[in-house]
Amino acid sequence: MNTRTEHDTMGNVEVPSEAYWGAQTQRSRNNFKIGGETLPQPLIYALALVKKAAAATNVSLGRIKPEQADLITQAADDVLNGKLDGQFPLVVWQTGSGTQSNMNMNEVLANRANEIAGTGLAAYQPVHPNDHVNHAQSTNDAFPTAIHVAAAIEINRHLIPAVKALRDTLDKKAQAFAPIVKIGRTHLQDATPLTLGQEFSGYVSQLDHGLGRLNDALKDLYELALGGTAVGTGLNSHPEYAEKAAAKLAELSGLPFVSAPNKFEALGGRDAAVAASGALKTLAASLNKIANDIRWLASGPRCGLGEIKIPENEPGSSIMPGKVNPTQCEAMTMVCCQVFGNDVTIGMAGASGNFELNVYMPVIAYNLLQSIRLLGDACNSFNEHCAVGIEPVPEKIDYFLHHSLMLVTALNRKIGYENAAKVAKTAYKNNKSLRETAVELGLLTGEEFDELVVPADMVHPR
């Protein structure tokens, strides 16, 4: 492999000749051969956006030259356009501040900027990775800013639209299924009736609440640490830098980013990420419940509940011919399990900072962005390949409805709870209908039973 010599404050390092990264990135590659999980692409792009905003702010404040800002901007745009995707090889399992990944970005942008300027790789003139790309920044404020920017962008552009689309599909189903009366179930046992539309309306409401929690979490993610520099004091940054840089990021992203009012919290804690993960976990709990309900309702086709049909997308067994499984439900619930685990990691990592800095940021970023991506993808997949094709099975719904012993609840007001319980237990013991049993016990006439036990009248207060 052909190499070139790069240097940092510890000396010279050989770097692949075609690489845009420099000495500190290469040291990290050499020292942290742990796993294969690299930092997510949205985080890389967010960090490039941070550098672009910083350059624009610094030149406006007279801290770097216009030529340097222009070159950094061009290089950052190359990153954002995907032209340098292969230049960020570092694994998650590195320094907990993300310093090596911050320097990876600084080195790549500096080398690309100097290549554009015609001075070539490793020249670091006219653009230096620390003095110009990283000007008025520390990893300690740039990296958490990138986490917030990446998470906010991904939640807004990927997750929220996916959840809304699934929510809207389920809402359409709820409206279409409104006239269909079915038996309810609690504790996996028969309960009183409701409509299939009411059942689905519960799913819609869960997702509405989930969207609300995501929007609440975004409020904290919009607060940026940039300008806190090393420990939150803003050392080596212009007094106006923090506010202007946040405003520039808001302009570049189209999202309402602001400078965090307290930089010590913004560097020392990762509470916004923990809260966002909590919202993701709660959304996962909702989606897990919805997917489980749907696969139970679709169980069968002959020996299960079978009250609804879901699309048949692929063969389900390598040995049982004709078997089809609820695969979208299974994929969704596996995603939810992963998100639950990610939340545990993020919670522990967020709680483990010391004094002025949290040093678990790469693992927080990795798990947070994975949860966002997986939930968004899973909602899109579940919506497209399952939810839109859900259809009721009226004959199965009607069978269970009229064979349920819990219709006896409608008799409470007429014959009392204890007598109604006697009817249900006797009917079950003798394998007879509720109507027949109530008449045999002398508690009601058949006509009275028919007037009282009307499933369609049991789905609302009366």
From Swiss-Prot:
The active site is at H187 (proton donor/acceptor), S317. NCBIfam families: fumC_II, PRK12273.1. Homotetramer. The keyword Hydrolase does not apply. Its EC number is 4.2.1.2. It is found in: Cytoplasm. Substrate binds at residues 97-99, 128-131, 138-140, 186, 318, 323-325. It catalyses: (S)-malate = fumarate + H2O. SUPFAM superfamilies: L-aspartase-like. GO terms for cellular component: cytoplasm. Disulfide bonds: none annotated. GO terms for biological process: fumarate metabolic process; malate metabolic process; tricarboxylic acid cycle. Gene3D superfamilies: Fumarase/aspartase (C-terminal domain), Fumarase/aspartase (Central domain), Fumarase/aspartase (N-terminal domain). There are 2 substrate-binding sites: the catalytic A site, and the non-catalytic B site that may play a role in the transfer of substrate or product between the active site and the solvent. Alternatively, the B site may bind allosteric effectors. It comes from Neisseria meningitidis serogroup A / serotype 4A (strain DSM 15465 / Z2491). This is Fumarate hydratase class II. Keywords: Cytoplasm, Lyase, Tricarboxylic acid cycle. The record marks E330 as: Important for catalytic activity. Transmembrane segments: none annotated. Pathway: Carbohydrate metabolism; tricarboxylic acid cycle; (S)-malate from fumarate: step 1/1. Pfam families: FumaraseC_C, Lyase_1. GO terms for molecular function: fumarate hydratase activity. Belongs to the class-II fumarase/aspartase family. Fumarase subfamily. CDD domains: Fumarase_classII (cd01362). Involved in the TCA cycle. Catalyzes the stereospecific interconversion of fumarate to L-malate.
